[in-house]
């Protein structure tokens, strides 16, 4: 997400696995190239592009809808943290058969311990179709996985996630003759951003396509085209709890960090 944007269905990470192929090697490689550059049309869809887990409750739910033929789905939670072998979450049911044009509620359950209690954390919910066996031997079967972020918010956080984008600290600094944009997140929530644009004079640069900045994290980006003759402005889209995008902007300074303000909220 990319790490930042909350993808709608196939904008999420997907795993396309070649299960069985009885054709010649050259044909398989050619077909694989087409599959990797073509959006796979899955039969299942999720009711949200992100899942916010309120730590005041023992579980959070999301609905899987099957728009195709009968399918078996497998669901689990994992982490992108290096070295993490498991996370204190379970999904029930972990395996479910969903009939065509029907839906299945997935319950993500927290074990009660193991996650930070002073800030928001992120894990990933995976929902994967398991291809059904076919009678045809010369068959290429695909396992399509959809992956969305689960934002776990422990109970007792004295902060408002809606204000998180306005708490980011933006600053331009000069480092060895280069202009560097710094972004600091002093808050308790992750901020997912997209379409980050820096305007200085007649120049408009997009130093970041999309990203997510964690609580307490700072990111830096070198600005290639910068005009010091005018006041620079930054604008960006931030994804809220409902998966919609709100636009923020601020006037930058190289003397002190500044906050952005909301200028357009999604309906």
Question: PLM features: residue spans?
Answer:
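Terminal connector regions
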Residues: 113-157, 230-267
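Beta-sheet-dominated interaction scaffolds and their linkers
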Residues: 42-63, 160-175
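Asparagine-centered strand-capping/turn motif at beta-strand->loop junctions
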Residues: 64-67, 181-187
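Intrinsically disordered, low-complexity Pro/Gly/Ser/Thr-rich segments with frequent PxxP/GP/PP motifs
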Residues: 87-115, 203-229
């Amino acid at each position: 997400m990319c790490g930042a944007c909350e993808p709608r269905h196939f904008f999420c990470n997907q795993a396309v696995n070649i299960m069985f192929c009885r054709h010649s090697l050259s044909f398989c490689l050619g077909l694989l190239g087409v599959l990797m550059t073509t959006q796979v049309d899955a039969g299942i869809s999720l009711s949200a592009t992100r899942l916010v887990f309120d730590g005041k409750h023992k579980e959070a739910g999301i609905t899987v809808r099957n728009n195709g033929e009968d399918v078996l789905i497998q669901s689990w939670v994992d982490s992108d943290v290096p070295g993490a072998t498991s996370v204190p979450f379970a999904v029930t049911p972990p395996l479910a058969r969903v009939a065509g044009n029907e839906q299945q509620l997935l319950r993500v359950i927290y074990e009660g311990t193991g996650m930070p209690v002073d800030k928001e954390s992120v894990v990933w919910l995976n929902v994967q179709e398991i291809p059904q066996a076919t009678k045809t031997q010369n068959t290429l079967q695909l396992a399509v996985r959809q992956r969305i972020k689960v934002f776990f918010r422990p109970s007792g956080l004295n902060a408002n996630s809606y204000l998180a984008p306005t708490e980011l600290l933006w600053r331009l600094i000069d480092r060895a003759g280069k202009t560097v944009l710094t972004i600091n997140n002093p808050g308790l929530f992750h901020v997912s951003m997209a379409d980050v644009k820096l305007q200085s004079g007649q120049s408009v640069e997009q130093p970041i396509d999309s990203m997510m900045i964690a609580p307490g994290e700072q990111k830096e980006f070198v600005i290639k085209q910068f005009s010091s003759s005018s006041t620079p402005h930054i604008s960006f889209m931030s994804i809220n709890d409902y998966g919609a995008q709100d636009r923020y902007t601020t006037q930058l300074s190289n003397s002190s960090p500044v906050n952005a303000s909301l200028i357009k909220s999604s309906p």
